[in-house]
Amino acid sequence: MESNIPYINAETSALVDKELMGTYNYSIDQLMEIAGLTVAKVVNKEFILKSSKKNLKIITLCGPGNNGGDGLVASRYLKEFGNDVEIYYPKKNTKNPLYTRLITQCENYEIKINEKILEKKEDYEKIFEQCDIILDALFGFSFKGEIREPFKTIIDAMKKFENKIISVDIPSGFDIDKGNIFDTFVPKGLVSLTLPKLCSKNFGGEHYLGGRFVPKKLFEKFNLKCDELYKNCSDLYVKI
């Protein structure tokens, strides 16, 4: 991937999302489905199928917002691809019918959804020791402020297992514009959606870009030169 790929800040990320669901008439369900499928394809093809170990165990950490929704969709597809998946959902979103449907879909795929909040970092570390991949879908680009419980304890525990973590869009706890200001974990892999965010500009791990739902003229509206991003690519993602 060429080095002049655009990285976008929090303001532009929010404006692009607003345009997609306004002018371009996407529903949040559609965007979440495409994003989740993209993440699942990256995890399965680039990490699971390339691993020398068989029967990998995946733990998906879901937050209450859209990033968590992406994680629910990704988990469903990963299960459909034949993987062992378990979801940790400490603040399950039961108010929005969209999330209720996603949860029911995962349950129908016999994916275990664990809602229990553990008090100690060591308790989460024991769980993470028993899996091969941690899919981080706690917080997305709209995250602001300090990391609060119950997520702080989870994120603190993740730092010991950076080589297992694949983050959805941005690593949870990162400031989208300033990066890792709370000195949290740095994941092994990152799947940026729409466009990579400023916080990932110097990311040194395996970096993929997906979420092919942005029309060319929307990129042009924000003066983002993206003509070459998916050149000669028929898949949902590319490696950066």
Can you annotate each of these PLM segments?
Residues 1-55, 218-240:
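Positively charged, low-complexity intrinsically disordered leader regions
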Residues 41-138, 146-167:
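Nucleotide and nucleotide-moiety/phosphate-recognizing core
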